[in-house]
A protein has these predicted regions:
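ATP-binding N-terminal substructure of ATP-dependent carboxylate-amine bond-forming enzymes
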Residues: 1-93
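Short acidic-hydrophobic, aromatic-tinged amphipathic segments that line or gate anion-handling sites
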Residues: 43-53, 121-125, 155-157
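Glycine-rich phosphate-binding loop signature in dinucleotide/nucleotide-binding domains
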Residues: 58-63, 135-136, 173
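A conserved helix-loop-beta module that forms one wall/lid of the active-site cleft
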Residues: 90-153, 159
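Internal nucleotide-binding/catalytic subdomain
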Residues: 152-275
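Active-site "cap" helix and flanking loop/linker of ATP-utilizing ligase/carboxylase catalytic domains
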Residues: 232-255, 271-330
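Peripheral (often C-terminal) accessory segments that flank ATP-dependent C-N-forming ligase machineries
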Residues: 295-387
């Protein structure tokens, strides 16, 4: 199959490599400014937001399936144009994806559908936001509304701190902000694949972050089958049904940042596609053919083709470290390894989380600075104490 991946982010490169590993017969093309450094794909020098040129490339080169990881391409309507042309594509319509780009839209929809989310306020004027903060119980969270690549989210414990934070957010050119109550539990991350009507869970992840590093562990033992069913029934399916009425449906991968509150959940925000280095975690555990899954969702036949997504009976542990902290990078290891412009990412899988974690941390100790290794150990120790 001729496959075009629209994106030049880490997920795009990982996806191309993973597809080729699973089935070397695929011809893979990737939109990137870089010259080809990997035999798994052919580079196509088209800008991600130049959707008409991408469409022409697909037409004239008889591309059979397109996968968009690029946020720029999605917000510029690549799925809308491809659907009109009759080209198979795995990506949400631009209007549907707005719930992942604009937190204010996500919050309003959750409020309308009675989906659990922290109490919030949406403001486009600093004086009104300041008055809301003055009457709030602390701590609170202040974040910018628009999120293309990352959302700035800051926790404030006092009014004076929040006042300065508000000034900074509005001075940075944000036209709208979201203020919400802070929930004193660790965030968890859940990803679903959907064809716009049905959805299946892909992976659950716990994350710890610190100076120059982040650590991810999957699956999360905090997200039980009962919680997953609740999220599907009370959040995902009502959301998909609502989106289908005004935006044509959401086909793609939708991520949730959630916090658990007693025996239920609260959704903080939605993600379009995998965030951080979570795709690497997913591929380390999945036993499914990735092209088959995505193509099934793109065709609207997810429920017909899959009852669930098959995973290994393993645990995955991922460490992302700033390149400045790496002393001796060994390419020939048993770990899944990747890199972006700033970080090296290492993933290990094993039959138990303890084994996956200890083996990888031994490796991190050998190849990274003592400082970052110590910070990782301290962060993991604190997490265990909280448990």
């Amino acid at each position: 199959m001729k496959i075009l991946i629209v994106g030049s982010d880490l997920n795009a490169f990982l996806l191309a490599k993973y597809i080729k590993i699973q089935d070397s017969s695929h011809d893979i093309y990737l939109t990137t400014e870089e010259t080809c450094v990997d035999e798994s794909y052919t580079p196509i020098h088209i800008r991600e937001n130049d959707v008409p040129s991408i469409c022409d490339f697909v037409k004239y080169n008889q591309i059979e399936f397109t996968i968009a990881t690029s946020q720029l391409a999605i917000i510029n309507g690549i799925a809308d144009i491809f659907k009109k042309e009759g080209f198979p594509i795995f990506a949400p319509f631009s209007e549907a994806a707005r719930i992942t780009f604009f937190n204010s839209i996500a919050k309003k929809i959750m409020y309308k559908l009675k989906i659990n989310t922290p109490k919030f306020g949406i403001f486009d004027r600093e004086n009104l936001a300041l008055e809301y903060v003055r009457r709030s119980r602390f701590p609170i969270v202040i974040e910018n509304d628009f999120n293309l690549l990352s959302r700035e989210s800051t926790i404030y414990k006092t009014y004076s701190e929040a006042k300065l934070g508000l000034q900074k957010v509005f001075e940075n050119g944000n036209e709208k902000i979201v203020i919400e109550n802070y929930i004193e539990t660790e965030p968890l991350y859940i990803y679903f694949i959907t064809d716009g009507f049905n959805a299946l869970p892909l992976v659950t992840i716990e994350r710890t972050s610190g100076e120059n590093f982040s650590v991810s562990a999957s699956p999360s033992n905090k997200i039980t089958e009962n919680i997953l069913v609740k999220i599907l029934k009370q959040a995902i399916y009502p959301l998909l049904d609502d989106i289908s009425k005004f935006a044509g449906g959401y086909t793609g991968i939708i991520g949730l940042k959630v916090k658990l509150v007693k025996d239920t959940f609260a959704i903080l925000e939605f993600y379009n596609g995998f965030q951080y280095y979570d795709f690497q975690t997913f591929i380390s555990l999945s036993e499914e053919n990735i092209v088959d899954i995505l193509y099934s969702a793109a065709n609207g036949s997810l429920a017909d083709d899959y009852d669930f997504i098959q995973h290994k009976e393993d645990f995955s542990y991922t460490v992302a470290v700033n390149k400045t902290e790496v002393l001796d990078y060994l390419e020939d290891t048993d770990f899944i390894q990747s890199e972006d412009s700033e970080k090296l990412i290492f993933t290990n899988t094993a039959s138990t989380m303890t084994y996956a974690k200890n083996i990888l941390l031994d490796y991190i100790q050998d190849v990274c600075t003592k400082d970052v290794y110590s910070r990782i150990i301290q962060a993991e120790s604190k997490k265990e104490l909280r448990i």
